[in-house]
Amino acid sequence: MARVTVEDAVKQIGNRFDMILVAARRARQIAVQGKDPMVEEQNDKPTVIALREIEKGLVNAGTLDADERQSVREREAAEIAAVAAIAEGRSL
């Protein structure tokens, strides 16, 4: 089991409270949404992976926001394409 200290992660984010929010969002992406880790897993839980990514400067609130906006754009584009296909009378 890996030991992770949050001090380096806090330095990357700025304060403990924002670090917790960022780590929770990223851990949820890994665990629930199936996003790939940006660091070696080493049989770690998603929260530990998220903290390691933050420590290395790979993840912050800005990168998570950008990723979320991109996902929304892709989902909206797929919905528009589906509606257009239905309107044209063909199925997907």
From Swiss-Prot:
Name by which UniProt lists this protein: DNA-directed RNA polymerase subunit omega
Domain of life: Bacteria
Purpose: Promotes RNA polymerase assembly. Latches the N- and C-terminal regions of the beta' subunit thereby facilitating its interaction with the beta and alpha subunits.
Organism, as annotated: Shewanella amazonensis (strain ATCC BAA-1098 / SB2B)
Record-level Gene Ontology MF annotations: DNA binding; DNA-directed RNA polymerase activity
Keyword Transcription listed: yes
Catalytic activity: RNA(n) + a ribonucleoside 5'-triphosphate = RNA(n+1) + diphosphate
The family this protein is said to belong to: Belongs to the RNA polymerase subunit omega family.
